[in-house]
């Protein structure tokens, strides 16, 4: 079904306003990386909360300089208030203490450090933290638990990456951001396509069929292959979904023990 993106913008703005108000807040804060997802969330928040929507720019020691430039240009274009906190000194300490740390460990540390800054700012300014992860990332578990996946509310969490692109065009997100390869910018040379093995234009149709067909039952890879999807693609994507499903779940808490 073709989405009406102008109506979607109105819906998401209404969602943000009501959900923030429901939680007793008037201000919001979010991380702005210079990438597509955070740019979309930033513009939506600016539409609703104006000067009460604040962006944090948190470059690390390995962040690409052009990403910071793109974030600053977005703030200027849409009059977005922002604060910059460099996390480079902190990730340098981590690297010096854990010299054998993998790129994934370093990336996760940076993601969690950014979330620590966001929640500290939220406490200082009485603001609510807004998430910027899309549905493709969430289904694939392509994010850091208690890092970039952490938030109070998320306006784009049910939009696949390809849908976020379409929404971004309607919001007049700069072409520089629209055209850059998706990347979490967690280490030099990192990109979503390299990590996942496929572009979102290939992944998203499969994710949509998985959601439509297997919401209440285990994923059947044979059924997906019969729909015409490449078997290796199906195997890799379903494996990711199953391996990382726990990231979308609340912590399991033992029920109260009542001895007889």
Curated annotation (Swiss-Prot):
Pathway(s): Cofactor biosynthesis; NAD(+) biosynthesis; NAD(+) from deamido-NAD(+) (ammonia route): step 1/1
Top EC group: ligase
Binding site for deamido-NAD(+): 112
Matching Pfam families: NAD_synthase
Keyword entries, A-Z: ATP-binding, Ligase, Magnesium, Metal-binding, NAD, Nucleotide-binding
Function: Catalyzes the ATP-dependent amidation of deamido-NAD to form NAD. Uses ammonia as a nitrogen source.
Name this polypeptide is given: NH(3)-dependent NAD(+) synthetase
Gene from which this protein is expressed: nadE
């Amino acid at each position: 079904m073709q989405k009406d993106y102008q109506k979607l913008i109105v819906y998401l703005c209404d969602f943000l306003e009501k959900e923030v108000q429901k939680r007793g807040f008037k201000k919001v804060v979010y991380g702005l990386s210079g990438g597509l997802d955070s740019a979309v969330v930033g513009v939506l928040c600016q539409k609703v909360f104006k000067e009460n929507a604040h962006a944090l720019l948190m470059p690390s020691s390995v962040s690409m300089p052009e990403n910071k430039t793109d974030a600053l240009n977005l703030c200027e274009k849409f009059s977005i208030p922002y604060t910059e906190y460099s996390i480079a000194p902190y990730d340098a300490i981590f690297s010096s203490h854990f010299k054998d740390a993998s790129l994934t460990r370093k990336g996760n540390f940076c993601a969690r450090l950014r979330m620590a800054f966001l929640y500290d700012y939220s406490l200082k300014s009485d603001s609510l933290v807004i998430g910027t992860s899309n549905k493709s990332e969430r289904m694939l578990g392509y994010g850091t638990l208690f890092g970039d996946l952490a938030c109070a509310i998320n306006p784009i969490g049910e939009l696949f990456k390809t849908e976020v692109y379409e929404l971004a065009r309607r919001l007049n997100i700069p072409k520089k951001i629209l055209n850059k390869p998706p990347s979490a910018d967690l280490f030099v040379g990192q990109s979503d396509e390299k990590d996942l093995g496929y572009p979102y234009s290939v992944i998203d149709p499969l994710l949509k069929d998985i959601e439509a067909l297997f919401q209440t039952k285990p994923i059947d890879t044979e059924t997906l292959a019969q729909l015409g999807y490449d078997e290796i693609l199906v195997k890799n994507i379903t494996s990711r979904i199953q391996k990382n499903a726990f990231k979308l779940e609340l912590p399991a808490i033992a029920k109260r023990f009542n001895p007889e």
